[in-house]
Amino acid sequence: LTLSVYATASDVLRHLAPPTARAAALARLRPLRVSRVFLEGRRGDEYVPPATLAEVRDFLAAQGLASAGGIATVPGTNFGVRQNEGLGWLNWEAEKTRRDVAHFFTENAAVFDTLIVDDFFCTGDTSPASAAARGTRSWAAYRRDLLVSLIKPLMLGPARAQRPDVQLIIKFPQWYDRFHLFGYDPERMAEPFAQVWVGTEVRNPHTRRMGYVPPTEGYVNFRWLHAVCGEKTTGAWFDHIECTAENFTDQAFQSVLAGARELTLFRLGDLMADHPGDALLAQRLPELFELAAKVRQRTPHGLAWYKPPNSDAEDNLYLADYLAQMGLPVLPVARWPADAREVCLGAQAAADPEATPRLQAHLAAGHTAAVTPAFLRRAGPTAQRLAGVKVGPAAEPTEASRVQVGARHHVLPRPLEVDGSLVAGTARVRLAGTVAGGTSVPLLTEQRTGRGRLLVLNLRTFDEGDLHAAGEWLLCPKPLGWSELPAPVAGAVREVLLAPLRVRLEAPAGVGLYLWNGAACLYNFHDVAVRVRFNGRALELPPHGPYWVERPGPARRPAAAASEGDFHGAGRPR
């Protein structure tokens, strides 16, 4: 594991270009064991001349630090052409945008042997020029085709003309369920780049500005991009924005648990401002390096969450983040996981035209699948018959304020977002919730299908309409109750979903579970220590930290489980 720091163009000019400022910058880098600094040459109108970059590069080399170049492809008054929609992205049909980006790579490849493209290589432009170029394609397909087509003429070509062996890195943002809408196509984009960096910058999950993003999203994003892009997926990149010290180190640990081999801290200016996360990260580096060594020796496994590339999420946006936050060992995959013991299918999986026959074969082999109402709606009547339930032609968003576990009713700290159209037919209702008016709705159903089991988890996150209503384009627009399940309710869900994996976890939501062959790791996102039971073993998890378990062994099942009550009335027509 190595650490690097990204210096924006303004950071370079302020903290590294003046010789009198360099000692202070080095004093911030040394405690974090930084071995490389990315020196950005362009961010809109912020610009560092090549001669200055070369001088800083040589200074860093004399201090034993490697360097690389970087660009944030954002518009400025004198750089590129701004798109006509709300976010500060470029219009890539504009000739000036193309000319300016190509010029950057010509200039900077002469200085650096490695260049990284920050996560603004996207667009939401709908100008007449873009509309004409789009033709009959969807906006999403057009944008992906456009940006993929520009990599070689605007980036690789100009860079290699200066330095034939130059290495280019693409950095993807964290909003994986929205990539395909705004031009990101990881499957095709990874091919021309030497390496892939992943945004694991989830920040503070309790603040609105950067979205109420679950702290598990960085892990999910990295693992899914690794599934798409393979071993090119090398680095994780996260920042200090809105973070407490603990939020900041959570990002580091989640990146390492996902398999990152390099951690890039954004940005040098925040290190110079004495963000408290840096001191805490420096203190916890031995723990982080030890964890990285353990993870690198092993192959992850768990609940295979299937998201094909370029798949729409509908009302299951960022579903996997919430599953992981509930303590389910989510393992994102981008191809059908034929050998998986258990699969999880949200609306994303239904983008695979073979999803239903593959599901049938999976069940026929005696395996387990967990699906959402959104998947069943897209997959159609055959999938609904397999599950023993029905869903309406459109989702009926509602909230469950109470959950029945066995004979007890639990009032929830935050209501659960569910689909009120789900009706249990022949399926057994394992958990039921109470929605407005006292109506009961299934939360978890089970149907035996041959030797297999098909579960329906009535989990709704949010959809395009929810984003628009909140004025949000990319990230989670509100906190969800699924992230705050009390221990008895979370345990009842886990009991059913973890059984095929021979794992048992009794804990509140906010405790993550990660599995490898012969090992497991628990991660406590809470601000206080949490007592849990894992496979029958009582453990106390420190706040904001990992707890590694070697040879966890199979789960020990208690004599009676609280979630074994049946609620066959739930979700039936009233």
Spans of model-derived segments:
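A conserved amphipathic helix/loop scaffold
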Residues: A347-R574
